[in-house]
Amino acid sequence: MSITNVMNQGMTRRGFVGASVIACLAAAGLVSFAGEAHADGAQTRTVTDARGEVEIPANPQRIVDLSGNSDMLKIFGFDVVGTANSDAYDYTKFPAYLEEDLAGATILGYSYQDTMDIEAILALDPDLIIISGVQEKMYDQLQSVCPTIMIQLAQINWKEDVQAFAKVLDCEDKATAWLESYEAKAAAMGEKIRAEYGEDTTYLSFLASGGQLYIFDAAGFGMVMYEDMGLAKPEGMPQQENVSLPVVDYEGLAAIDADFIFAIGTDEDLKALNESKPYQMMRAVQDGNVVELPASPYFNQGYGCIGKDTLVSEFPYLIAGEDPAEARVKARKDMAEESADTEATDADDKQDEGAADDKSSSETAGKTK
């Protein structure tokens, strides 16, 4: 499936589905979950998905994810053995922001493909397979291999989607902790950017593709800037009701008055953009405040959890004009340090809790004597 088909499949707020955005039926109260202990001691959970009840491992170890949500599984603490979270422009590789997190997983295709190689899936010996409605026609065949659950795709609220998916795998606490950490990080980065570049400075991001401009408003890159980081939108944004990725021509783009522009596209599309007279007249272009980014991976990066997190970390380097590849290296280093700090804090908290419990036990024992 081409990137144009992906964009054509979802232009409205309700219809646009990023490669890594899901909402399971649990969000609407249509999925039920019940833990069940077998006589042999094996722990399972019963999930009622769009196709009926499925008994799945309580702690799956070999997940094959075809739904495009392997990044969510990663933040829940699962390592997938097979994935369809491939690059939107090259299905044989991972998007750059997922290379480290999905290292070792086998790429089985792209999440918008309705069929994938069943033999390749079998070879991975999965104990749980996760699909979206896109792959529904494979459901019965996959169910004969191992427990398979189908996640219904929709865009409602990405944070609720994360929690709903976490509920399926009984890891809501991890999802909540990650979301709280991300929200705090994005807000802090927004404050840092506003302090350095001005409270009222405005930012615009768009994808140039085939002579059309897809404006990231309430989706992707734009959602990260406006909703997560709290940066200001420019005047002249296209008003298209219930559309999160509005499409404009060059004249429509030139009507948007932004202080900074993030132009995303292939080399060919960016060349055509730079040759456009209306684009050349934009204030940000004339001021030299344009950051050009490759379509792979930045078209999709603002949709998934890890992509969003990485983009927030990259932002100060990108806006300063650093090469995107170098910005990613520095961002990943920053993220590794953040993770280490969090782990150290968690360890200290557990140690303090343990000491408090020991003290309480000692005091109780003393009173008993």
Regions found by a protein language model. Give the residues of each.
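C-terminal segment of N-terminal export signals and the immediately downstream linker at the start
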Residues: 10, 33-46, 53, 364-368
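Basic- and aromatic-lined ligand-binding clefts that recognize polyanionic substrates
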Residues: 62-76, 177-232
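A short, structured surface patch at a secondary-structure boundary
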Residues: 66-120
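Proline-aspartate-enriched helix->loop->beta-strand connector
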Residues: 118, 122-131, 147, 258-259
